[in-house]
């Protein structure tokens, strides 16, 4: 986090960065998330996603979710506006998700770039109040076939 903050500051000295050199846990997540209006997820595990989801619900904050696995990605916006669908609606059985085997090693470099760009677009739509936010919907992409879909939750 600190190295990333230093590199970003070198690119743009006008931005304000608050790096957290600690893992997000039940002990610190509530206070960290409380400082922000929108939460954007870039984590790589189910436990952290459930934690972020539950705190965003408690604090009534939109949660912009993105996940990748190899050549596949998905994005959604939870707990936004009148749409109260959340991560637990997408994956209701937390224990089952924790038992899943780890994904295969390696991610195609453009997969996180595409998913992150879609997440950033959703944040801009929320902030600026334009377009249809992915609230209550899940957008998926498979980069092997370039097929994308949007599903209602």
Regions of interest found by a model, annotated:
Residues 1-153:
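Adenine nucleotide-associated cytosolic modules
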